[in-house]
Amino acid sequence: MSQDNKGNGSKKRDFLGFTGLDAAKIIELFDYSLFIKQQRETNRNSDEFRPIRHKTVAMIFNKPSLRTRVSFELGVYELGGHAISLEGKSIGVGERESIEDIARLLSRYNDAIVARLHEHEIIETLAKHADIPVINALTDLSHPCQVLADAFTLYEKGLWRDDIKVVFVGDGNNVANSWIELAGILPFHFVLACPEGYLPDETLLKQARSNAKGTIEILHDPMEAAKQADVLYTDVWTSMGQEEEMAERLKAFAPFQINAKMVAEAKPSAVIMHCMPAHRGQEISAEVMDGPQSIIIDEAENRLHVQKALMVKLMNHDVYRKFHLTHRLHRAANRLKA
């Protein structure tokens, strides 16, 4: 998650994925996300908590966005900063100007870069040549901010534990890749149920399995995968840029819809998750999407809180570190009282 700045020996922290994080650091981020969420609920109109006051965040969007754009722009505003939205086509990432020059220039103007791109190599190049934090807001390879919010939602609801069984039903896409990457760090049981030919990134899978404290499975029978699941998770069957494959994908994924029959295979207490946008009647039935076990809107909301916590960690680490020092002192004091 961190890398050396060029020449000055100090640390620049990026968030391109879960590499460099351990379980303790992720739980710390979840605890700070809870604090951020509580701050918003109790002090929404207060000017007291503005840890990135007067800082600017350049936001590069090469892909359409609703949740990512709104949650990041609002998050920057609520933390006291200012977001500058840049459409990828207008600045010509890697075409009109080189990625290296864009990274160096934005580093002179801004305090962080948030990028939602197609090629993962572009965000890696941005991070390599920028002197400010770079956050991966989605690439074709991964979507770590989404999965961070997903796992936080389970943590917040008291559902996260070492033996939790999370079943991702659908395409081995960028969201599935990030779940696999997380499963290489946190000890839990992750199952990807996908058709043959729609597997996740082989390199990420191999690396996660070599590090995994829990279990990572790839199955091709969705009903078998769903048995005794604590979480049933899905995403669209046809992602941006795959529209020409839609007919073929609809046929391949037809048995992989999360519906009442599949939910019946999971634990009675199981929750339903979807990163959205959702296509009711395709990857998930309307009955399940809007049913009592769905926590889909909760996870969408939590994008805001987790990303705010992440930005404070990257842009004002002193505030982030002070919270955790205080948090540890409180816990120690409570243990002594007990």
Curated annotation (Swiss-Prot):
InterPro entries given in the database record: Asp/Orn_carbamoyltranf_P-bd, Asp/Orn_carbamoylTrfase, Asp/Orn_carbamoylTrfase_sf, Asp_carbamoyltransf_Asp/Orn-bd, Orn/put_carbamltrans, OTCase_ArgI
Keyword Hydrolase: no
Pathway involvement of the protein, from the record: Amino-acid biosynthesis; L-arginine biosynthesis; L-arginine from L-ornithine and carbamoyl phosphate: step 1/3
Binding of L-ornithine, residues: 174, 235, 239-240
UniProt record, GO biological process: arginine biosynthetic process via ornithine; citrulline biosynthetic process; L-arginine biosynthetic process
Compartments where located: Cytoplasm
GO CC annotation terms, alphabetical: cytoplasm
Residues binding carbamoyl phosphate: 116, 143-146, 275, 303
Reaction equations catalysed: carbamoyl phosphate + L-ornithine = L-citrulline + phosphate + H(+)
Domain of life, per lineage: Bacteria
Enzyme Commission number: 2.1.3.3
GO MF assignments: amino acid binding; ornithine carbamoyltransferase activity
One Pfam family per UniProt: OTCace
Keyword line: Amino-acid biosynthesis, Arginine biosynthesis, Cytoplasm, Transferase
This protein's record includes keyword DNA damage: no
Sequence similarity: Belongs to the aspartate/ornithine carbamoyltransferase superfamily. OTCase family.
HAMAP family in UniProt: OTCase
Chain's role: Reversibly catalyzes the transfer of the carbamoyl group from carbamoyl phosphate (CP) to the N(epsilon) atom of ornithine (ORN) to produce L-citrulline.
Protein name: Ornithine carbamoyltransferase
Organism per entry: Chlorobaculum tepidum (strain ATCC 49652 / DSM 12025 / NBRC 103806 / TLS)
Encoding gene per record: argF
